Amino acid sequence: MAARRTRSNARPISKTKRALAAPAEDRPGWTFLSNHAHVLLLIAKEPEIRLRDVATQVGITERAVQRIIADLETGNYIERERVGRRNRYKVHRELPLRHPIEAHRKISSLISLVVDA
């Protein structure tokens, strides 16, 4: 494989500058909600959703979804029930959000804002 030729006085373009130079639809985006919130919201909307579908909709790997599910279970935000070969999840909507800034709100507030709207 041939090395990429550059002018000796040319500086490499950083990933950030390359991303900003891309058209808006190609730029990597950011969101106000975390991947944990996205996974929780999808489960609240569809309790029998497959991890593959969660991964596709959130834009992360299935392995990342598994880790998030484990975090949510450890925090008692969700319960997993085995139904045949599938899982059914129950969201504990009465629990508070985790960060001190939003801890005065319950999970149900977030779900009603995004899913139930």
Predicted regions and their residues:
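Amphipathic alpha-helical dimerization/coiled-coil segments
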Residues: 2-24, 96-117
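Pre-recognition alpha-helix immediately N-terminal to the DNA-recognition helix
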Residues: 37-42
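Short, cationic-aromatic polyanion-contact patches
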Residues: 25-36, 50, 82-105
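Central "turn" residue of the DNA-binding helix-turn-helix
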Residues: 47-48, 59
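Alpha-helical residues within the helix-turn-helix
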Residues: 56, 73-74
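Key DNA-contact positions within bacterial/archaeal DNA-binding proteins
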Residues: 63
